Every structure is written in C-alpha cells, then in structure tokens.
Amino acid sequence: MMKDEVMIKSGVVNFVQQGEGLPVILTHGLAASLHDWDDLLPELAGAGYAGYALDLFGHGESHKPADHDEYTFDAVFEHFSAWIDSLNLADPLILIGHSLGGGLSLQYALLHPERVRALVLVNPFYDIRQLPPILQIAFRRKLLDTTLLEYLPYRVFRFFVDMSSVNFSIGQRRTHVMPKHIRYQTALDYTRAASGIYNIPRSLPNLIPELSRIQQPTLLLWGNRDQSLNPGSFPTVEQKLANVVASHTFPVCGHVPHQCHPEQLNPHVMEFLRDVTLKA
C-alpha cells in the first residue's frame, strides 16, 4: 500500500493507493477517515483493481481550516473532485461511498457522468431529512458549539463508540457488532476530525430530484439498525436511481456495515464489480 499526499487549491489531501487495474475511489463518511476501507482495499488490489482512499476535507490528515464557515458540502466536494483530477486517471471510475461519501459519489456522478463507470453506495447520506429530527434541528439552526468537541479526550469518544456498538439482542453471543480494532480507529478518527465538519450537513443539497439522471449501474447496501440515518430512507434511493442492479441489507449492522461485517459486505461488492467490468 502506498501512502501519499497531494497539494491542491483547497489544501493537502492525504490518501492511500493499493493495487493496479481499473480505478476504484473509496470515500468515507462524516468524522471518519480512509481507514474505513482497511478491509476492502486489499481485496480490491488482490482482484486486479487500483483502489484509492482519501481523508476528506477536515478529516484525518487532510486539510483542516480553522474557520468553521469554510466547512460546507460544496467545499468538501471541491476538495474531493480536485483530488480525483490530480490522479490523472484515464479509465472511468468506480465510486464506493459510505454516508457522506455516498452523497459525494452521487454528486460526482451527476456532474461528471462520463467519468463514472459504476457506483457502490453504503448507507448513503443524500438529504438532511434522513437524520433524526433532533439532529436536523441542531444542524439547521446551529445550536451546537462544535468547538467544544476539540477539548474532548479520546476516552469520551471511545465510550460513545463502544455504547453504539453493543448488541442488545437476546441470544447473541457477541457483545459488540464492531470489532475492537474498528472501535479504536473510529474513536481516534473522531478526535482527529476538525470540529467544523459538523457544519457540513446543513449545506447538503437534496439530491432526490436529480437521482433519476444517474444511469450507471449501482449497488446499494445498508445496515438496518442505522441510528444516524433513517434506514427507511435507503429504499428511496433504490426507487429513484435508474439502474440499481442489486441491493442488500445487513440486519445486525447499523450505520457502518462495511466495518460491522466486512466478511459479509465485501463479497457483494466484489461480485458487483466483476459483473460491471465483464460487461464493460
């Protein structure tokens, strides 16, 4: 795996690249990092794809402006799009996006359809109305002073990550739906993210009216216990997109099925990519 940085107009982009072949762009969600894809990247490389995963604007080791007003969906998209341009990839892209990364992937397909071969959407965030009502109010009215989050230690984030991972189902042997190393990385990513990123959801465009214009083959995957986004919102994407060739739900998983059960999710991705590339 090659770790690299590139300087673009909107600042440094930290990313990793693994494998050779058709390009696959992997994009994480809010308050996460490129480590979301630590399980999928090696599989892609082993199957003959070139996987590229970045830290989004304000996340991980990428550019983090001090001014919270700079954190908008458009700014994140510009940073993401300029990074893709910097890679100088000749082949059309396969876009894999989780949550906010799914919204960015959809927006990229809308604006640059000729550059996109296929889409894989994991619990995609495409409309602020997917959030629980209390979070919609908080994000829209800027009730939260997110600067305070910068002073919270790792152990506080780890406590909330661990609590959200507990499996309360009767008869389940596992106490957590996410492995320990994933919970560690998730909490660490929260501490590394700029506090301004929580301003991004309020500027998220409602993509629903535009989705029917996306013609590329799409795989839709989601966790049925998502507490961050309404799981009932994901079938809307399936109905609106013109070419969803397959979809699958993961009953035990919440917002991050790619980390909850990668051994179950990754085969769906790899099968979809094989079908897409065979038909190309």
Pin down the residues of each PLM region:
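Flexible "cap/lid" loop of the alpha/beta hydrolase fold
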Residues: 110, 119-150
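Catalytic histidine-centered segment of alpha/beta-hydrolase-like enzymes
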Residues: 253-266
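Active-site loop/oxyanion-hole signature of alpha/beta-hydrolase fold enzymes
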Residues: 56-96, 267
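Conserved HGGG/HGGXW glycine-rich cap/lid loop of the alpha/beta-hydrolase fold
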Residues: 16-63
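Conserved alpha/beta-hydrolase catalytic His-Asp/Glu region
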Residues: 130-131, 152-213
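Gly/Ala-rich beta-loop-alpha elbow adjacent to hydrolase catalytic centers
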Residues: 97-101, 105
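Alpha/beta-hydrolase fold catalytic core
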Residues: 1-25, 46-49, 77, 85-91, ...
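Conserved loop-alpha-helix segment in the C-terminal half of the alpha/beta-hydrolase fold
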Residues: 213, 218-253
